[in-house]
Amino acid sequence: MHSRPRHASIVPPAVTPGLRRAFAAAALLLLPFSRLPAAQGAIDPNVAPRAAALEREGERHMAIDLLGRYLATAPDDGRAWLQLGRFYLYDARDWHIHGHKGEPDGMLYLDFAATALEQSIRLSVDSGLIFRGIVEAERGLVGIETVGWAEALAGRVRAPGIPPYVLELGENLLASCPAGGVLLTGSDLEALSVWYGSMERPSLDVLPIRPDLYATDSLYRDRMARTMGVDPSLPVQRALGDVAPRRTLCASPTADSAALPRLTWMPYRLVRVSRPATPAPDAMSVNELLKAARQSTSPWVGDVRGVYDRAAAHNLLLCSSLLLLFGDSPPPACRP
């Protein structure tokens, strides 16, 4: 199949370099659907790690070009598709960081990421499901920045599935925050699980906040500040401090402590809350994680278990209530 320069040659000269790259990427992403036998080449297991190394060295564009040339001849390498999808996801995030300017825009990068990640899922790459879900959460972020939290929440459509134990984590985190509360998430895994959990459990009236985005993304900060009823010019810690007298703040196990206002925090289920919480009617469940721990070799099972481990470091009651999960390998906080 054609290399990247030949794909790029179909773009008119007046088109910007960003759009030129977008056309090239779009042409590449059509390759798996062409089903041309001539496009099939041997899978090279070294290409995906080489691309990852380039990205770590700050050469993401070179990594994408490498993957593009390679996947044009070896479209059945699922790990290479995963890397390509991740890199387009990172490009979308950079678009936010750079003031929501430039071409392609963030949504187009997310479209590219979704297409590449769906190829990795087709080829049974475990992490494809996780990163495909993150793409949907990032699309939700663009929706929040465009129309606000309430409208974005109401307008969400059914998203591609994620592993049940990840969804279960999100539901447990949301159920750990009292109704009307503000849930501060930390890791991408937590943010993903909570985003999906809020779709499955819309009756849980909890507002998720990503403090890292609040600190760095002006559009996100403006929309979420208005939702919380605070001044958008305030830094995240002061903004949350203004919210605390009116709404319970809930800090997830991986939430950045630097973003938390100086309040008396107390453990409640999987989170720490800014004021005493009324016992919730819904019980937590870890059945999906227990099932995955027995049946799956995915590293994401361990990552999800790690969130529960970190929660136990703040709430020793979890050492007994999650005894079935911890089993013979309890987290350090639960060891004698």
Residue ranges of predicted features:
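Bacterial N-terminal signal peptides that target proteins for export
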Residues: 4-23
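ER/secretory pathway lumenal C-terminal domains and tails of membrane proteins involved
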Residues: 40-180, 192, 196-336
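Signal peptide processing junction and immediate N-terminal pro/mature segment
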Residues: 35-39
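Intrinsically disordered, low-complexity regions enriched in serine, threonine, proline
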Residues: 1-3, 17-18, 32, 291
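Bacterial N-terminal signal peptides
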Residues: 24-34
